[in-house]
Amino acid sequence: MRRKVSLTEGEVQQVSAACARAMSGVDTVSGEYLSEAVLVERAGWLTGLVTGLADAVVREHWNHGDLARLASGRDGAGAGLPARAWMALRRLGWSAPVPAGRYLPDRVVRVVQEQAGRVLRSVWWRAQITAAVLATWPADPERRTEAEWEALRAVLPEDGGVVAGAVIKARTRQAAAYLKKHGRLPAGITACEEAPGVGGQVVLAAVDKQLATVERCAEDPFRYGVLTVRLPLRPDPVSRKDWPAVRIRFRIPPHVPADAALCLPTLRIRDGRLLLDVPYAHPVPKAESSGHRVAVAFDWGLNTLLTGGTLTLTGGAQPHVTAGARSVAFRADGVLAKGHRLRIQGEHLTARIERLSTLAASRRERGMRPDPWQSAKLAVLEVERDRISKRRSRLNTALAKAAARFMVDHALAAGATVIYLEDLRDMEARGKGRTLNTRLSQTVRGAIVTHTRHRATAHGIAVVIVPPRGTSKNCPRCLTTFRHHMAPDRSATGWAWATCPNETCGYSTGRDQAAWQRIGARGLTHQHTTRLDRTSDTYLIRTVIEALDRASTVLPEISDRTKSAPTMKRPAPGQRRGVPAPPGPRTPPPAG
């Protein structure tokens, strides 16, 4: 099983994932053919064992002390903890409690510890934010003063530079709800939240060939793969004989390269099917953080989700940025409106479910029998809410993939080596009200950036996040503060249109049109300050240098109209007929 690929100069290894469906299997001990239904049943037993034990490990160590020990990266002797979660848990002595009378191979216990360790490690970032919010609890949780914001930013993890304002507000609302219910502030995140679950899956990446192997099918290596994994014969295995190896055949998706190295998958059961999330490694061109000459930049919007264009950094002693004559726009009005409608329906159903749940709880407290009508209605509403949630999830996934493909395709067509975007995870339109801000927060910008970065990496294009402050405020050509109004022919103060008050400039354009030029110019002039965030594997420009930002004016691209050929001596023909004129008078006869 090969997990690494051979690389040449200028290439790096990218790990992607593809979802495959288990078709059939064969028991390697008895030679029995296993249908898909049998595979689903036996994989379900394995998933139940792993999930139950992993949840028990998470609940046992759901306290601030154990979370801090795991996040510190040091064991009791001061030695560094391994990067793999199951190794770190074993170093700390956190074992999985196997029930009496059950037999689980050591590699299955590895899977349990790996999934539990990943969940516990992922909690620490939220725990730090919650601790910072509680340590600097404001007088009014709904509105912090400037001094309170400064005190909070000083104690946030990673200098507070990458913590979105929406995350801070969510943690503040969570603590405020606890305070309202219990009359005191919580001690930490473990008091605010229940222990999280690990999900119904089996992560085989933590095991070796004693439990599972994956390889391409010998008969057709480009279309099919074979997973060999030990699955239990019964839901309560008691000996090693209850863990025979099973060869599972699956079809490799067509977008997986032929030279990609397959890695051990993650098993999931969805809608009566056994799904395999198969990671694969393949070589891609290396994306550089600096040295860019041609870039594309995009600005976020509401109905016009993305507005952007191409920018070029010229050479010479005084380099300057020129913007392309034409911009591009990704309009998703209908999709966003549909998502907004589904969100409203989901909120309405949630409110009805909460009312019915309150009524049912009230009847139980008074010793009354549950109302059959209420129970049936509650079940129907919960099913409908789940259905709408799945529709929203599918819609948002399709929107994120389409927007990512739009940006990467435009970058390829323009010959750009970098895509500049804003960090607007908590974008709010000031003075626009809660409804519009809710719609702005539901446009899956984080998923769009993730899909864009993944798709761009395959082509060696870097995706860099630029600080958003002031990109819509100043004119991209002279950096004078814009005057925003409603439309080109309506001077009333508004949002959509921007006009430069500088008489020598007078640039007038849409707000988003000016913003993407400022984003691209800021990225090109600050590209030497680009840094790689190791936690998210994202290129970031964390701070803006005022001198560079003031010099990052954008010049319009002017086509060369120099005369390159002599003037034609033959004059242009007049308005002549292409066919002979019809017989008869050329002027209409007089009336009457």
Regions found by a protein language model. Give the residues of each.
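Nucleic-acid substrate recognition interfaces
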Residues: 1-592
